[in-house]
Design a protein with these regions (language model features):
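Conserved beta-strand edge residues that scaffold enzyme active sites
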Residues: 108-109, 173, 198
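Active-site neighborhoods of divalent-metal-dependent phosphate/nucleic-acid chemistry enzymes
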Residues: 185, 198-199
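Short beta-strand immediately N-terminal to the catalytic nucleophile in serine-hydrolase-like folds
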Residues: 195
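Active-site acidic carboxylates
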Residues: 1-160
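Internal catalytic-core helix/loop-beta-alpha segment
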Residues: 140-192
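Short glycine/serine/threonine-rich phosphate/pyrophosphate-binding segments
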Residues: 199-206
């Protein structure tokens, strides 16, 4: 700890902890941290590309696409569609010859809603003024957040590429009732780069 502390004072860099994860397997990348509290105006963190995954959280039609839940319920679609282009730019860069893994998550429920908790269904109906998960709203593509429906799938602009992972989940958090944790362990992932929606719910619950 003392050695890493002294290194940080000199370089403003959180060094990759080889003592914890072992030797670097891919490229050692260094990124700037903005607005890092208690560490000054600027700091950097190192991570191993081979142990890193981009997580694209719930970029589904229901949340950010035309005729999805957010759209047909009259909410401001630009708020959830705004991240599409930046995420696409990130994916294009990652897919261009890097060994960083890409993992998409997709929230949804069985057609019979057997995996939908009572409180989640009730809350969705309250927020939707009577239209909740499993219902087909007027103007919508299909039942809201039901697996297999067109509006449940990931938007075309961010369609997973061959070899990328898609984790289906029934909860807000990706670790609950899914293969997310097992997949990270299998791939040897130690660092996550988070993208997607929504920051205060499905993204935050992974962190």
């Amino acid at each position: 700890v003392q050695e890493d502390y002294e290194t940080f004072l000199e370089t403003r860099t959180f060094k990759f902890p080889s003592w914890l994860y072992g030797p670097v397997q891919g490229k050692l990348l260094k990124v700037e941290i903005e607005d890092c509290p208690n560490f000054g105006d600027k700091a950097f963190v190192e991570f191993d590309s081979a142990r890193t995954a981009i997580i694209v959280v719930d970029m589904q039609v229901d949340f950010c696409g035309k005729n999805g839940y957010v759209d047909v319920m009259g909410y401001d679609l630009s708020l959830t569609a705004g991240p599409i282009k930046p995420i696409k730019n990130i994916l294009d860069a990652v897919r261009d010859g890097t060994d960083i893994k890409v993992i998409h998550t997709r929230e949804g429920h069985m057609p019979n809603l057997a995996d939908l908790p009572y409180n989640k269904l009730l809350r969705s109906k309250i927020i939707g003024k009577g239209v909740g998960i499993g219902d087909k709203p007027e103007g919508g593509e299909g039942q809201l957040l039901v697996r297999g429906e067109k509006n449940w799938d990931i938007i075309d602009d961010l369609t997973p590429a061959d070899g990328e992972y898609v984790i289906d989940k029934s909860a807000k958090g990706a670790f609950a009732h899914s293969d997310f944790g097992v997949t990270l362990k299998k791939l040897g992932i130690t660092h996550l780069i988070m993208t997607g929606i929504t920051t205060d719910v499905c993204v935050h619950t992974i962190m």
